[in-house]
Each structure stands twice: as structure tokens, then as C-alpha cells.
Amino acid sequence: MELRFPRFSQGLAQDPTTRRIWFGIATAHDFESHDDITEERLYQNIFASHFGQLAIIFLWTSGNLFHVAWQGNFESWIQDPLHVRPIAHAIWDPHFGQPAVEAFTRGGAAGPVNIAYSGVYQWWYTIGLRTNEDLYTGALFLLFLSTLSLIGGWLHLQPKWKPSLSWFKNAESRLNHHLSGLFGVSSLAWTGHLVHVAIPGSSRGEYVRWNNFLDVLPYPQGLGPLLTGQWNLYAQNPDSSNHLFGTTQGAGTAILTLLGGFHPQTQSLWLTDIAHHHLAIAFIFLIAGHMYRTNFGIGHSIKDLLEAHTPPGGRLGRGHKGLYDTINNSIHFQLGLALASLGVITSLVAQHMYSLPAYAFIAQDFTTQAALYTHHQYIAGFIMTGAFAHGAIFFIRDYNPEQNEDNVLARMLDHKEAIISHLSWASLFLGFHTLGPYVHNDVMLAFGTPEKQILIEPIFAQWIQSAHGKTTYGFDILLSSTNGPTFNAGRNIWLPGWLNAVNENSNSLFLTIGPGDFLVHHAIALGLHTTTLILVKGALDARGSKLMPDKKDFGYSFPCDGPGRGGTCDISAWDAFYLAVFWMLNTIGWVTFYWHWKHITLWQGNVSQFNESSTYLMGWLRDYLWLNSSQLINGYNPFGMNSLSVWAWMFLFGHLVWATGFMFLISWRGYWQELIETLAWAHERTPLANLIRWRDKPVALSVVQARLVGLAHFSVGYIFTYAAFLIASTSGKFG
């Protein structure tokens, strides 16, 4: 018999319907479910695929460098980073007429181009790249790494080079190598680059390349202070406040500082502070990489650590006993932990990229700031929901009740009703108490009595900001109390520039907050708690619930258990994930709306618009969404087109994709099955058309698959729509 797709499942390969294709694609990466899979082969396949992932990442970043070097304007941008628009790549479109060619020819280019809103120009500039040749060199190097990764992936699939199962299960060695190798050594290497190339080359005008790399001294006395123990010398004579970035004017000689705050000209963190930070990180992680015991006999055994964690008084059962083997033998548990950590870090990156910008001049590129914040928050949302999805799969496929008797994991399952009901209460409370004031304020505005709004000052948040040095609110506490010991000690010991930065209104550090912020923070809290409720309930009920005690026998994603148990529809762990993604998107919508509107008013110098309009719903709809979409809808108008046309088209297209999602989410399997059978009947009776036959009988998607397709369209359309709105409304105002 001929081999048909999918080769990894003979059962599916023999399916006579089109289900074979869709289920084949859906389970292609679920290695655990494949025929003839063993635990060892499973680990080896995943390990080899990591090399493929790295190859794709290196190829993609290489492409960024290559296209900017080939079609961008990097060399002219660095002459005037604040006024020249950075070009991502050229556009070639045979449909372009003359008006379009003119509209998209900008940034000093000869033809139509796309503008870069990713911040790569600022990054490359800050770390010391100066010419197109530098960019080409970087692109080639990354291409080389990509090739190397592919070879590595192929090599580790060869019998001789396949790592054994015991190698994959050696958690202590892996942690040591990842901590000291991945984080420690790479942070040290980055410190080296900043000190040897970026600080002398990028910041102080001494262009460092391969040919003079060994000649340019990063510090006049070289390693002297390090070897004689006078480390404080490396912090003396920093760049002055009138330093012109990229020149020797006002430049110092310090390489590792604790200045705090921002470089007055570039509005970004001091490079010498960044180098110091990475050196500290490297030091910590190099030590941490020697923390776990391997065959050298030093350090801790993770298993011993966990077993020793017996809670005092015995009130929490057997503590962490059994956790080591549970985690070490479950890829889904490990992936869940990794995704949870990565998701949180990605969201932190979004927060810190705008509040503490690290790259020269990026803070004044408003569209890039908005795009990077939004991008990282959406990525964080998807990654965090994924963490709970794999947590649920762990409970279904990998959890062993005997191994985890009365430990923290078992006790989480034992009192899940209390956890879920408390989360439900918190979500309900936040929902009613946030929507209530918004609706009340809306009605008051509509009736012409704005003075009757419920406006609550966020005094606790303002108090926290004051403790960090913000003097606006007059709290006179800790770092905002100029007579207090904290303030005086802080001025002398650390970060003298920090307090200036906190109290300047030209950056995004500790933005002044009021009643509008108070309300939207609670709206976001509602979204976060509801998303968490759905995800936590999905994971904790994944093995079974009072309604369906045998749920784990049905697997991760099932539609229902037939008409006999009617209440079993929509309660699989997959359905919880599916519902949570809608809430996640909803929440990040509020987060990005808030961030964008507050910053637009800040950048335009009319913060009162946000303060006055953000306290009621019509304010958000009219003064944020409607007002800022006007440029967008003007991409095409009776006078022709302009450079926002592409975003206007994307805005419409995004809505179309989003709306298509509902076709899959609302009309289900029976409707489509009837339609398909009618179409197949018509096809077979139509001359010429009936010459074409298909081997598989066409059938509708399953309920779960249709939901996935609907969710994918909803998510992609939602993000496309907002991306177009965000970029067009920001670049339309600020260029």
C-alpha cells in the first residue's frame, strides 16, 4: 500500500475523508501521539527541532540586517537620527501608479519604501555599527550561525550523535550550563562588547572596527585598576551632561558607572550604566551556574533541596516531596514553567523599553515606542496563555497522584474549588466596581452634569511614586522628602541622575496619574483576573470535575461526550484555553489603548485631554478611537492617496479577517457538512468540473478545529486592525 500523509499515524493515513489532512496537520507536532514513539525519541526530536528554531531566528535577523544594508538609509540616518526616517526595505509593487510611488518615496530614497518602526536603527547605532559594510558583515555572520544551527540539528538526528535519555534528564548539569553559559557568559560577552566597542566607538566617537579593535583602549589605565583592586576608578570621570553622543565633546573616560537617569541628548540610559548592569548580571549568573551538584561534588542536589522543604507545623502536608521527579519527567510541566517565566519577562520588556529606554534617540521615535510596547505585550499574552495550556496537558498526560501524595501539587488540586471561587469573586467584584463608575460617569456627561462624576484619586499608587522620588503630589516621603536621610544618602551613594529623571516631564518614568488612570487600571485588573480564572480553572479541572469526574480519559481537547451527557460540551481543558485567549486579547486591548492614548497626549502636550476624557466610556470611544482613526480612514480620499494608504487598507483588511473568524465561531459543523455535501453533489454533476475527482471524501472540520480556525482569524484580524490603527495614528501625528 502506498504511504499517505501523515506517515506518523497509520490510523489517520487510512482515514477515507479530508479529516486525514486536517488532523494530520493538527497533530504533526504532537510527537507524543505518534506511532512508535519512545520517550527517548521524543526528547531527541524536540532537541533537534530547537536547532531548526535557532536557524530560523538567525536567518530572520540576518534578513533584517541585509535588507537595511541593501535598501535602507542607515548611513544617512546616523547623521541626523531625529529627523531622517529610517527605511526598513524597498517596496516593489507592479500595481503602483504615480501617486502611490510619490506617496511612499520618503526618507531620502529613490523609490517607494517601508519605514522601520522596530527600533533596529537605534539599536545598531547604539552598539557601535556605523556603515552598511558593518550591517552586511553582521548579516553574513548570522547566516553562518543559521547554517551551523541547521547542521547541528541534522547531526543530532544521526544515530551516533543522538543524546541519550539520561543526558536529557540531567537537570543539574543543564541548569548549571544554562545559568553560567547562556546567561553568565553571554552577559559578560555583552559587557565586553559595550566596553570595548559601544562606549568608545559609538558613544565617544572612536569608531571601533576589526582592524583597530585591539588598539583602542576602552580605559586609559587599562586593566590596572582591576588588578590593583581600585575598581572605583572605572566609575570616575563619566560623560558630562553636555556630552554630544557619537563625539568626544563632553565625553569622559569612565566605563562602569552608577549615574542613573538619562543622557540629556539621547534621552536613553547611560551606556556606562548599562555596561555596569550587565557585568553585575554576569557575575551573579556565573556564580549561580555553580550552584547545583553534578559529578564534581560541589553545590546542591535539587532533589535534596525539594525533599528538605517540609513546611513548619505540617500544615501544608508533605511540601515539595515528589516534585523533582514529577517535573523532570514531564516535558509539559517544564514547558509550562518556561513559558510562564518568558511571558512575564516579555511583558516586563514592554514596560521597560519605554520607561527606561536603552537605545540612543529611540525615546523620541514615538511610533517605534508605541509599536514595540504593543508588540511585546501581545507576545507576552500568547506566551502566558500557552503556559497554562501546557500546565493542563501536564495534569492530563503526566500527573501521577501516587508520586505526589499530599504535596503542594496534590493540595492545589484538593482545594481547587476554593481557588476558583475566590478568583471568580475577585473578577466579579472588579467587573461591577469598574463598569459601575464608567457607566455612571457616562450618564453624568450625557446629562450635562460632569461635576457629578465619581472620580477617585489613586492615592496609594501616588504614594508609591512619591517614595521613589516623584515630588509632584507633595507627599514628602522617602526619596521625595528633600530633608530626609533617605534622600541625602541616595544623592551621595547611588544614581544621582535618577531623581532628576523621575521629576522631568520629558520621559515616561512614573507618569503623573489621576482618576482616569485609576479606573483603567482596575479595568485591566478585571481582564487579568478573568483571564487567569479561566486558565486556572481549565488546568485545575483538566483531570476531572464534579460534573465530569472521568474527564482525563477524554484527553486535552474533546467537544462533548455525546448527547447522553449533555453538560459535557465546552469543558475540555482546550476549551478553557480557547475562551481565555479572547479575554487575553481583550485585556491587552485595554492595556495598549491606555498606554497609547496617555502617551499621545503626553507627546502632544495636551495631557488634560486624557485626564478629562478617560473617566467615562464615551471619552474612550470618541476621543481616543474615533478621533485617532480619522487619519487612518483618510488613507484614501477624493484627492488621491498618501503614505497612510497602506495602513488604511490593512485596517479594513484586519476587520475583514476578524469578522471571518465569527463564521467559524458561530455556525458549526452540521451547517458546513450540509453545505459541503450540496457543493460536492453540484460538482459531480457539472460538465468539465466533474473530470476532477478527489481521493478523500470532503467533510466539515470538527467542532474543536473550527474553533481553532475561528480563534486564529479573530486573533490575527484583531492584531492587524490595531497595528494599523496604532502605526497610522502615531506616525500621522509625529512622522
From Swiss-Prot:
Extract the Gene3D superfamilies matched here.
Answer: Photosystem I PsaA/PsaB (1.20.1130.10)
Q: Which residues bind chlorophyll a B1?
A: 655
* GO terms, molecular function: 4 iron, 4 sulfur cluster binding; chlorophyll binding; electron transfer activity; magnesium ion binding; oxidoreductase activity
Q: How is the cofactor bound?
A: P700 is a chlorophyll a/chlorophyll a' dimer, A0 is one or more chlorophyll a, A1 is one or both phylloquinones and FX is a shared 4Fe-4S iron-sulfur center.
* Catalysed reactions listed for this entry: reduced [plastocyanin] + hnu + oxidized [2Fe-2S]-[ferredoxin] = oxidized [plastocyanin] + reduced [2Fe-2S]-[ferredoxin]
Cellular component, GO annotation: chloroplast thylakoid membrane; photosystem I
Q: Name one GO biological process term.
A: photosynthesis
InterPro entries xrefs: PSI_PsaA/B, PSI_PsaA/B_CS, PSI_PsaA/B_sf, PSI_PsaB
This entry's Enzyme Commission designation comes to 1.97.1.12
Lipid metabolism found in the keyword field: no
For this protein, the parts annotated as crossing the membrane are: 46-69, 135-158, 175-199, 274-292, 331-354, 370-396, 418-440, 518-536, 576-597, 644-666, 708-728
Q: Where in the cell is it found?
A: Plastid, Chloroplast thylakoid membrane
Q: Please report the record's description of how this protein sits within the membrane.
A: Multi-pass membrane protein
Tell me which positions the record assigns to the signal sequence.
none
Q: Does the keyword Transmembrane apply?
A: yes
Q: Which residues bind [4Fe-4S] cluster?
A: 560, 569
Residue positions annotated to bind chlorophyll a B3 are 663, 671
Give the record's keywords alphabetically.
4Fe-4S, Chlorophyll, Chloroplast, Chromophore, Electron transport, Iron, Iron-sulfur, Magnesium, Membrane, Metal-binding, Oxidoreductase, Photosynthesis, Photosystem I, Plastid, Thylakoid, Transmembrane, Transmembrane helix, Transport
Q: Where, in this chain's numbering, is phylloquinone bound?
A: 672
- Major subcellular site: plastid
- Quaternary structure (record): The PsaA/B heterodimer binds the P700 chlorophyll special pair and subsequent electron acceptors. PSI consists of a core antenna complex that captures photons, and an electron transfer chain that converts photonic excitation into a charge separation. The eukaryotic PSI reaction center is composed of at least 11 subunits.
Give the protein's biological function: PsaA and PsaB bind P700, the primary electron donor of photosystem I (PSI), as well as the electron acceptors A0, A1 and FX. PSI is a plastocyanin-ferredoxin oxidoreductase, converting photonic excitation into a charge separation, which transfers an electron from the donor P700 chlorophyll pair to the spectroscopically characterized acceptors A0, A1, FX, FA and FB in turn. Oxidized P700 is reduced on the lumenal side of the thylakoid membrane by plastocyanin.
Family under the similarity heading: Belongs to the PsaA/PsaB family.
> What name does this protein carry?
Photosystem I P700 chlorophyll a apoprotein A2
Q: Which organism is it from?
A: Zea mays
